[in-house]
């Protein structure tokens, strides 16, 4: 289990954001429930400045980064269309 309650990812908005790989929406929702940019960076192996840019709607295209985000936050990779291989 990751640092975020798995039920957080079950809502309709989160399912849609994850399916679209919309990390900006994911991070904004996590910020609204009290997670800091520093925490997000630590959990996902990113710098705080990278998290900040994503919060400003910079898109994440790298599969490797998407996998780190999914794994770091405890999101099942399949929810983001990623494999476990």
Summary of predicted features, one role per range:
Residues 37-42, 51:
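Short alpha-helical "recognition helix" segments of helix-turn-helix
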Residues 37, 48, 66:
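Helix-turn-helix DNA-binding elements, focusing on the entry/boundary residues of the two helices
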Residues 58-71:
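Short, basic-rich loop-to-helix N-cap that marks the start of a DNA-contacting helix
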Residues 45-61:
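Recognition helix of helix-turn-helix/homeodomain-like DNA-binding domains
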Residues 1-35, 67, 78, 82:
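A short, Lys/Arg-rich alpha-helix, primarily the initiator
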Residues 43, 72:
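Residues within the alpha-helical elements of helix-turn-helix
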């Amino acid at each position: 289990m990751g640092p975020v309650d798995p039920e957080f990812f079950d809502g309709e908005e989160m399912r849609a954001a994850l399916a679209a790989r919309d990390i900006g929406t994911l991070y904004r929702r996590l910020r609204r429930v009290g997670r800091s940019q520093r925490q997000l960076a630590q959990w996902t192996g990113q710098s705080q400045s990278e998290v900040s840019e994503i919060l400003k709607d910079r898109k994440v295209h790298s599969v490797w980064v998407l996998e780190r985000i999914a794994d770091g936050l405890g999101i099942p990779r399949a929810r983001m269309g990623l494999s476990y291989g």
